[in-house]
From Swiss-Prot:
Entry protein name: CPX chromosomal region candidate gene 1 protein
Annotated region described as Disordered, given as residue ranges: 1-77
Organism in which the protein naturally occurs: Homo sapiens
Biased composition (Polar residues): 44-60
Entry-linked InterPro entries: Znf_C2H2_type
Expression (tissue specificity): Expressed in a variety of fetal tissues.
UniProt gene name: CPXCR1
Length: 301
């Protein structure tokens, strides 16, 4: 009976030993598995962490490069535009002479000018030497009687002549002005018609409504020929030969110019001097007073 008890005790001891040995194994396995897993997880987690900054840095490097490239392109385009604008300005800019400084007397300047010239265009000065031909407006006007007469008539026609009386009712007619100038090369007892620019003032006999309703065409009142036109002259000036010879007497010349009167008159010039033509009766008068005193110059006419 004792033998089976030994066997039972042995089996019980073996079972106890096994029971004692099994928990440590289980604990060790349970402890070892977490110790191995964190390392693997850390490695797995560190790898994406190490990889993500790399991708971010690569993207950050690409973005500044693109921005720098775009800035360079914009700067290049701006430079090209500025260069194009500079070239266009240089092509279009023309120096406008505002200040002319001469180192020669007046007699030499009447022919040509080759001295120092100061010009200004926009904001930068240009100093260089030029040679150019002076126009007639730069010359001294009081040289002889012919140029004096032409100058005075030019001023009168340029400032006070209205349109031809034969076409005074129209608004679209091309405005021509006549000045009868004496010239040595012209024929005797003939008139020279010169077209000047438009005057600063235009005088009409009728109001605007009547001119608009009267029609576009009108009949000419000329009865003496096609060479004579009726015009309105303001500040009619008569200069005799004595006054022409003493033209430098400024006071007397200014007194003549200050006389202002409005009248329908035609100034003609022949080899005998200036003549005043009445457009109503067609007579010629030597003086302006005779023209005013004759019957056609009344207020009704």
């Amino acid at each position: 009976m004792s033998y089976p008890t030994k066997e039972g005790s042995d089996t019980a001891g073996n079972a106890h030993k096994n029971s004692e040995n099994e928990p440590p194994n289980d604990c060790s396995t349970d402890i070892e598995s977490p110790s191995a897993d964190p390392n693997m997880i850390y490695q797995v987690e560190t790898n994406p962490i190490n990889r993500e900054p790399g991708t971010a840095t690569s993207q950050e490097d690409v973005v500044p490069q693109a921005a720098e490239n775009s800035e360079l392109e914009t700067e290049i385009q701006k430079d090209q535009r500025e260069e194009d604008l500079k070239e266009e300005l240089l092509l279009l800019q023309t120096p406008i002479p505002r200040k002319l400084v001469s180192h020669k007397p007046l007699n030499d300047r009447s022919r040509s000018h080759s001295g120092k010239v100061e010009m200004k265009a926009n904001n930068f000065p240009i100093n260089h030497k030029t040679r150019f031909r002076l126009s007639t407006s730069w010359r001294v006007p009081f040289i002889n009687s012919h140029e004096i007469r032409s100058m005075i008539l030019h001023l009168l026609c340029d400032r006070y002549f209205s349109q031809a009386a034969g076409c005074q009712n129209t608004m679209w007619v091309k405005r021509k002005y006549i000045a009868c100038l004496y010239h040595p090369n012209s024929f005797t007892h003939h008139e020279r018609a010169i077209t000047f620019r438009r005057p600063s003032r235009v005088h009409y006999y009728r109001p605007l409504t009547e001119r608009m309703t009267s029609g576009k065409f009108c009949k000419s009142t000329d009865t003496k020929g096609k060479c004579r036109f009726r015009a309105i002259v303001r500040s009619v000036l008569f200069v005799s030969q004595i006054q022409i010879e003493s033209i430098f007497n400024i006071k007397g010349f200014v007194d003549i110019l200050t006389y202002i009167h409005t009248m329908n008159v035609m100034i003609t010039n022949t080899n005998n001097g200036w003549k005043y033509f009445c457009p109503i009766c067609g007579r010629l008068f030597n003086t302006y007073s005779e023209l005013r005193q004759h019957s056609c110059s009344s207020s009704g006419n």
